[in-house]
């Protein structure tokens, strides 16, 4: 059996698909030390630059002094601390939905929602470019799993119209993690209301970045109706929020159903309460420091100007995710390694994370990048385009 595994690993390496784990030797930042070398990095999801913020470091220390470093039990036994409860209430008020429920990861949050609400006899409708967690959850639920072409609402409408399923659940990324484009949330909600379907919106990459005071994709457009029983909202707390975890926001009966039937909620140790305590401070910074989002917008515009004439197209995106489409995996890896030689870290994204022939450099920006950082990346890529 080990020989089979070794052969499969060799084949993966020959195809340019082998993955390895870089080891960071300091805090998350645009300037990092990896395996003993200093790099300018454009690959983290720390969009607002909060992961190493002094106020969050102090809040984490305060949380540890108050609650210790481990929760010791699941939320349903004795692992639900005051800090968890206060954060859930603060998040509900922030996103404007009645209730929220904390999870250790976005993957676990999506898994809980989909498997608790859908099963045999039900149907799940999914955008073809959704995150793996939504796909895995749909498969595990044993509901009928129906995918529609990326952002193709006409096809989705036909699928919803013809289904005989007992329950219908539409699942989609709000901001697509590998393309940086956004789902038409208002139109999706209208469809779901028309066909009596829930909409699970995964806003992992929009929360903190988009909308009024960073409230996320629900606030990116004035046309989005948030006071509806059809909406289920998920966002993560380890990206723009700079810490760790995730939450689901919805009407009270949905949240109570997740508490009763969400297996990834009830059958796991709760996240340390010190993280929830830290996230209360993070939420204040997200809400109050609008300059971070304003700066991100300026950096996004600057990057797109610097890269517009390259032979590799930059996909359309107004978010911090700026994918440079390369094509073949080997070419993406070549660019990745050539940038590393120049002290710049932008890992290649290859299948199966993206479709075959769609390998790319996923450039992600942070509010704490500088104009000089962006210019340096642009100059390096223009130089490589001549090679």
From Swiss-Prot:
What is the protein name for this chain?
8-amino-7-oxononanoate synthase
Give the residues the record marks as binding pyridoxal 5'-phosphate: 106-107, 177, 205, 236
> What role is this protein assigned?
Catalyzes the decarboxylative condensation of pimeloyl-[acyl-carrier protein] and L-alanine to produce 8-amino-7-oxononanoate (AON), [acyl-carrier protein], and carbon dioxide.
- What is an example of a Pfam family matching this protein? Aminotran_1_2
Q: Gene encoding it?
A: bioF
Which molecular function GO terms apply here?
8-amino-7-oxononanoate synthase activity; pyridoxal phosphate binding
Whether Transferase counts among this entry's keywords is yes
Q: Catalytic activity annotated for this protein? A: 6-carboxyhexanoyl-[ACP] + L-alanine + H(+) = (8S)-8-amino-7-oxononanoate + holo-[ACP] + CO2
Can you tell which superkingdom this protein's organism belongs to? Bacteria
